[in-house]
Structure formats: structure tokens, C-alpha cells
Amino acid sequence: MESSEEDDEYPFIESITPQSKIDSVHQSLTEKGIRKLCCELMDLKDAVENMCGDMRTKYLAFLRISEEAVEMEHELVELRKHISSQGILVQDLMAGVCREMDDWNRLPGDVHDAEVEEDPLPNEVTDPKSEFLEKIDLLLAEHKVDEALEAMDAEERSSPDLKGSVEMSSYKSAFMERKAVLEDQLLRIAKQPSICVAELKHALIGLIRLGKGPSAHQLLLKFYATSLRRRIEAFLPSCLTCPNTFPATLSKLVFSNISVATKESAAMFGDDDNPAYSNKVVQWAEREVEYLVRLVKENASPSETASALRAASICLQDCLNYCKVLEPQGLFLSKLFLVLFRPYVEEVLELNFRRARRVIFDLNETDEGLESPSDFVTILSEFAIASDTMMTDCSIRFMQIVQDILEQLTHLVVLHFGESVLTRILQLYDKYIDFLIKALPGHSDEDGLPELQDNTVLARAETDSEQLALLGAAFTILDELLPRSLVKVWKLQIENGGGEGENSAALNSSAAPELKEWKRHMVQAFDKLRNYFCLQFVLSFIYSREGLTRLDALIYLTETPDDLHLPSLPFQALFSKLQQLAIIAGDVLLGKEKLQKILLARLTETVIIWLSNEQEFWSAFEDESNPLQPSGLQQLILDMNFTVEIARFAGYPFKVVQNHASVVINRAINIFSERGINPQSSLPKTEWFTEAAKSAINRLLMGSEDASEPEEYECEEEEEDDHHIVLPEMDDDSDSEDTSSLSTVDSFESFASASMADLESPSFTDSES
């Protein structure tokens, strides 16, 4: 009962196929498939072997038939010789038989008739023209072209029928036919692909003797063109293994072939006496140069790689040198080569500088081919301590990629494409400057700066040290590293910069005027970064975080003068911030005193320029509802003189600052005069403002209100240091700028290291305290 229930519960168990049976079935099917496949492969192998055997048999049969054909040709030649000799024997036999028969049949009474009767057969047999033609036929049949040519030349010189006959006689026609056969044989010899140079020259000389000079000249040029193609086809597979040097080998093959062909043409055809041949050689050489340029383009590395630039440079250098060597032979190919090759070089330069932009501005981009010169890394890494390392990497990449591009250039590339290279370096540096400006605080899309194509965003340089490090890196590239690299390429003399250390290199602009113009534009590009930094620094000083201005006209309308004659609080703050910045600059820009003075002088200048252009500031003075006091004008003039004295005291180029301050003072005097205040009667003398400004600087440095007015320094006029970089707006005054007697490094350091109670939150001296 239980078993029946189990059978009812599992009725399908008997229909299950065991796994072993499944495995055996699949195994048998797999074995059958493999056996079938092996059989098919064996059949295919047998078929291939049979086909190879048939091909081998047919090839051997073909070779045997070819040999038999050659032997048959020789037998035919021998048979033709034999027939010719037998023909001569038959003619001799016939002549002898005719004479004997004539003797036998001659009777005594028929003497007169025999003398009158003409026998045409002996004349026909002894005709020299027929003998000559038969001789030529025999020589042509035996392919003895030299003997045939000599015989035909001799006959043509001696036979009057060939030399002076105007009408075409039968003999002359037969002679010209055989001459055409000889020409055809010489052409076939010259057109053989495996012919050597000696055999070719021999055949061409024969054609020239036959009066076929143009055909011979064409065959000569065709031979050298064909041999060049074969040599290049054998060389091209190795281009991938030597991408930098293959253009040099190609140019050597092409131009050496042109030179040999030109010499052979002149020797065989006398190109100097026949301009038609020389013109043909020039046209042929131009086609070969076009072929060379096309080969270089087709087989070069990708145009954006440094190896492509190196290959193009070597090719241009070698080709122009070869063109110069060919000029004594009457071939002037330099201009043609430059016209053909210039677009390719420009393309390679453009794509390499595009690669440079990717490597510099896309910090995720890597270029394993770039080396890391220790001098670049060491010099620029000094700024990594004070700034973000990503920004320093950007500067290092800039110099690495530019140096890598410059190292690929040869002397003649610099000569013909130097201006283009300088322009692209300028554009790259300008992009680099825009890239750094994006890292400065205050940058926005409304600043009028061109957007970079990449989306890489640097971390903001928030602190003064980080911002100064950016400026220092950009200035070092401009003033030291780029000139040093260009000097090596342009092969100019290096001039030490005097106050900038032994490693400072300047370009000898008198030797390369384009470098002088390029340097001027590079300085202008750097000025964008410098001016943007100065503007943001001044704006952060003038405006509070709430957007309120600290430098307001109310300080000249409401505040009362004090007995200490100190500058207003905003200008005391300016003095403090400049002290603080000078200390930071002394650490970050160590050894870059030139840049420090440029920046700090520009900062003082920017403050006055902003004040001069701030219409809201001047509107407060022009508003008649605001009462004006002479003390306000006196305080404003004192602040301007104080700003000028800051620059003079620290040794900055202060002449431009003084000019801008004069503009502000004159404008203020005019406004106050229009409002009824007489400056002549209400203001002290000019010397008073100068002394008061000097005294204020001393008081602020000493940090004491009770300090007497010490005569710490007196101004002396001396020429500005000639070794300093003079900005474009300072060129007119560079030779006559006045600096303080403290315009030395010591005085600058004393200014930078002046004791401050708290540089972060300085305490200003208020006249009301």
C-alpha cells in the first residue's frame, strides 16, 4: 500500500535520463564532430598539397618552356645567319655558272653582240648598296648595335645618296628603315628595368648619335626617377623605427639622386649649350622635390607630437642645405621647397602648441615624453612653499613643454619660422597669465578676461603669499627661464642682469630685433596679472567686507586737523598694509627685488589712480550742500604727498606716483577754488607737506606720537638703477627718476622689517585720541 502511494506521488521518476547517459551522448557527439572536422581538415590539407604540387609542376614547366623559347630564339638567329650565308653562296654560284655558260656559248662572230648585250645578273650581284643593306640586316639580326651604328655612321658620311639627296630614293628609304630598327633596339635596351648605369649610358649615346637626343634625355631622367622610387620603397618600412631621422635619409636620397642626374645630363647632353635640356632637368627636379614633401607628410608621426616637429625641423634643415649645394649646378630649389613645406611646418607647430595648452592647463593630462630639467623644477618649486602645488605644477609644465618644443627646432627653422614660434609662445604665455588670473580672488566673468577653453579650475589663491607666489612664478618665467631657453636656440649672447644674480639672462635685442618686440609684448601680458593683483589688493583695502568704502570724501569734509599733521586713517592703513606685504614679499620673492619694487610701486600708484577716477568721491566735493574747509584740502594734499613719500622712502620708482598725485591735487585745488576757498592764503608751502609726510613716516615707523620730528632722511636725486626692468609707462622717466637716498636694499629691508605691534590688525594713530 505504501509503495503504491509512493508511485502515485512520484510518477515521473522513471522518465528521468541519467547524467551518465547524457554525458556519454554528448561525448559521442563531440567525438564525432571532432573526427568529422579532422577529416575535413585532412582533406583540405591534401587539396592544398595537391594544389601546391600542381603549381610547382606548372611553374617548372613554365621555366622549361621559357628556356626552350630562349633556345629557339637563338636557333632562329643562327638559322637566319645560315640562310644569309647560303644566299651569298647561291648568288656566287649563280654568277660563276652564268660566266661559264657565257664562255661556252660565245661564238667568234657574236663578239660584237656580246659586248653590246647587257647581263643584269652580275651587276645585281656586285651592287655595294645591296651588300651594305644585307650587312646591316645581319648585324641587326645578331643585335650587334655598336657595329651596326658604326657602319651606318660611316655609310651616312660617305654615301652621296644619303648625304645630299633631296628626293627619297629606294636606297635611302631602306637605309632609314634599318635606322629605325636600330633605334628601336636601343630603346628596348634602355627601357629594361634591370639595366645598369653603364649599359644605359651606352644605349643613350647610341640614341644621341642617331639624332634622338630628346628621347635619350627623357629616358635618362626616367631611369633616375625609377631607381629613386625603388630605393625609397625599400626604405619606407623602416620609417616607423626611426621617426626622427627618416626625413633626413629621404632628403639625402632625393637630392643626391637629383645631383647625379643633373651631372649626367650635363655630361651627356651639354645642358649649358642646349637650354631645352636644362629646363627639362629643372622641371624634373621640381617634381622630385614635390614627391619628397609628399612622402614626408605621409610617413611622419602624428603632427601634434614632438617627434613630428623634430622630423620636420631636420628635414627643412637638410633640404635647404642640399638646395644650396645644387645651386652651382643651375638648380635653385630653395624657394620651391619652402613654399611646399611651409604649410606642413606651420601645421606641426600649431598642433604642438595646442598639445602644450592641454598639458599646461589640463592638470589631468600627462605627457610621458616631457623631461624634468632640474633647473626649472628647482627654481619654480621655490614658490610651491607659499602657494598651492597645483599652481606650481602648472608653471613647471609651461616651461617643460616650451623647452621641449624649442629643443626640436634647428637653426634654419628658427631663421624662417622664428617669428611664428615667438608669436605662439606669446599666445601660450598670455593664456597662462589668464589661467593664473582665474586663481586670484575677485575674478568673475564680468572682468573682461577671455575664457579659457579648458574647464580646469585652480584653487583660489586667498592669502597674500599665495598670490605673490603666482606673480613670482610668472615673472621668473618671463625674466629668467624663457630668455635662457631662447638664448640657446637663437644662439645669442647672454647678458647678466646685474642686480638679479648670476642666473639672470637677457636677450641681446640688438642681434634679434624680433626678440625685443616679443619681449615687449610678453611684459604687457605679465602686466595684466600684475595690474589685476594690484587692483584687487587696493580694492580689498578700500572697501570693507560689507561693501562700504574706507576712503570716503567725508574724512576731508568732517574731520578736524590735528597738531601732529598725520595722514588720514585710510592712508595710515595703506602704509601698514604695504609694510605687511613687503615683509611677505621679502620671504616669497626672495632674490626678486626688482619684482618687489615693481609691485609695491604699482600698488601706491593704483591707490591714487583709483582715487582720481572715483567720481563719487569728487561729487561729494562738488556738491554745494557739503561745506568745504581749508583743512580738508590740506589733509588731502598731505595724504597725496604721504603716498609719494612712501614710494620715495622705500626706493620705488616714484615719478609716476608723483605725477598721478599732482593730478589729484590740482583737481582738488580747482574744486575748492570754485567753492570760494583761496588755496594761496589757506595752505602751507609745498615744502611743508613734504616735511610733514616724511615726519609722518618716521612717527609711524617709531610707533610713538610724542616722537620729535627727526630729520631721518633727506632726498637726493640719483639715477634709477639701469638694471631694473622699466615698465612701458615708465620708459620716458627711466633716466631721470628721483629716488631717496634710502633707495637701497638696506633701506628697503628697514622698511619691510619695521616693527609693527600687530600687522594683521594694526593700530592707527588717530588725531582725536
Swiss-Prot record:
Coiled-coil regions listed: none
InterPro entries with a match to the protein in the record: Cullin_repeat-like_dom_sf, Exo84
Cellular component, GO annotation: exocyst
Main function: Component of the exocyst complex involved in the docking of exocytic vesicles with fusion sites on the plasma membrane during regulated or polarized secretion. Involved in polarized cell growth and organ morphogenesis. During cytokinesis, involved in cell plate initiation, cell plate maturation and formation of new primary cell wall.
Xref: PANTHER family: EXOCYST COMPLEX COMPONENT 8 (PTHR21426), EXOCYST COMPLEX COMPONENT EXO84C (PTHR21426:SF2)
Source organism of the structure: Arabidopsis thaliana
GO biological process, one term: acceptance of pollen
Family designation: Belongs to the EXO84 family.
The name this protein goes by in its record: Exocyst complex component EXO84C
Biological classification of the source: Eukaryota, Viridiplantae, Streptophyta, Embryophyta, Tracheophyta
